[in-house]
Design a protein with these regions (language model features):
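Histone-fold recognition with a strong bias for associated Lys/Arg-rich disordered tails
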Residues: 1-166, 172-180, 196-198, 205-206
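A conserved beta-strand-loop-helix scaffold within acyl/acetyltransferase catalytic domains
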Residues: 181-229
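Conserved hydrophobic beta-strand within the GNAT/NAT acetyltransferase core sheet
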Residues: 223, 257-261
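Conserved acetyl-CoA-binding loop-helix of GNAT-fold acetyltransferases
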Residues: 228, 234-247
Length: 277
C-alpha cells in the first residue's frame, strides 16, 4: 500500500518520537504513544490532558526497554523500529484503507496502538483503553471564522469544472452519492431539490460527477457533507469545493460556519483555519 500520504500532525509526532530516544537506537510503541501525548494539538490535546501526568512513568518504562535488538527498516522513520511498531503501522494503514482515505493520520495510528499487543497495551488499564477508543471514535464539530476567511482561489484545475448543482442534477447526484458514499447523504442532498439556489457544488470531469460539497444541509451556516472520489483526492478538489461553499456563506453575511462531524480535521485546519469546538 504505497498510495498514501501522512498528515503534518502525524509527521510531527514521528519527529518527536525520533528526537526523544536518547541513547536507544530502536523505536518501540511506547515512544510513539508518548510523542502523541507531547504533540498536544487539537484532538491530541485530549490525550495530553488525560495522560500527561503519567509521562515520567512512561519514560521510565521506555528507558528499561532493550537497547540492542534487530530493528526493521521502514518508510516512516530513519530509526529502525521493533516488530510491534511495524505491526502497528501496518494495522494503521489497514484501518485507513477501510475508511477510503488517502492520508494516514494520528487517529489511525492511535487505534492500532491500543489494538496490537505491546508494552502500551500492557500499561494501559481497561478504562484508559476505553477512553482512547471513545476519543478515536467520537466525531468532532469544527468552527470557521468567516470574517477571517480570504482564501477563496479562482485558480482551479482547468481539467475539472466546478459548478452549482441544477435541478436537473438531482438523480445523477443521488445515484453518485449513494453508490460512492452513503444513502443518508444521498437522501439529505436530494431533499434540497427543487430550488432556485441549490447550496450544492459539483465537480465534473469528462461529463461525469466526481465530487460534491454542500452547505445548509445539516442546518443553517453548516458546511457538509463533502465527497470526492478517492482517485481524484490529490488534485486539491476538496479544497476548491470547501472554498466555494464557505465563500458563498461569507458573501451572504454569515460570520461563522460549522463543520459537523468533521472527518480529516487537519484538512480543515490547513484550508480554512477551522478549530474544534
Amino acid at each position: 500500500m504505497n498510495n498514501f500520504s501522512i498528515t503534518n500532525r502525524l509527521r510531527r509526532v514521528f519527529n518527536i518520537t525520533e528526537n526523544s530516544l536518547n541513547d536507544r537506537k530502536f523505536i518501540f510503541p511506547i515512544d510513539i504513544f508518548m510523542a502523541m501525548i507531547l504533540e498536544n494539538t487539537e484532538i491530541l490535546k485530549d490525550l495530553n490532558n488525560h495522560f500527561f501526568h503519567k509521562i515520567n512513568k512512561y519514560k521510565e518504562i521506555a528507558l528499561n526497554l532493550p537497547k540492542n535488538i534487530e530493528g526493521n527498516k521502514n518508510h516512516f522513520f530513519i530509526t529502525p523500529i521493533n516488530d510491534s511498531v511495524l505491526e502497528i503501522l501496518n494495522e494503521s494503514l489497514e484501518i485507513m484503507s477501510k475508511t477510503n482515505e488517502t492520508y494516514l493520520n494520528e487517529i489511525y495510528v492511535l487505534k492500532a496502538l491500543i489494538k496490537i499487543p505491546s508494552e502500551v497495551t500492557e500499561i494501559l488499564t481497561k478504562e484508559e483503553i476505553h477512553y482512547i477508543q471513545q476519543l478515536c471514535n467520537t466525531s468532532k464539530d469544527l468552527l470557521v471564522d468567516l470574517g477571517n476567511f480570504y482564501s477563496f482561489d479562482n485558480n482551479e484545475n482547468s481539467n475539472f469544472l466546478i459548478r452549482k448543482a441544477l435541478n436537473k442534477d438531482k438523480y445523477l447526484l443521488y445515484d453518485f452519492v449513494k453508490e460512492n458514499f452513503n444513502s443518508i447523504w444521498a437522501d439529505s442532498l436530494a431533499s434540497i431539490f427543487p430550488s432556485n439556489n441549490i447550496p450544492i457544488y459539483l465537480v465534473i470531469f469528462n461529463d461525469h460527477i466526481i465530487g460534491f460539497s454542500a452547505y445548509d444541509i445539516l442546518g443553517t451556516s453548516s458546511f457538509g457533507p463533502i465527497g470526492v472520489l478517492k482517485e481524484f483526492r490529490k488534485n486539491s478538489i476538496g479544497k476548491a469545493l470547501l472554498n466555494k461553499c464557505l465563500w458563498d456563506m461569507k458573501l451572504r453575511g454569515d460570520s461563522i460556519a460549522i463543520i459537523k462531524n468533521a472527518g480529516p480535521i487537519e484538512f480543515y485546519e490547513k484550508c480554512c483555519n477551522a478549530y474544534i469546538i
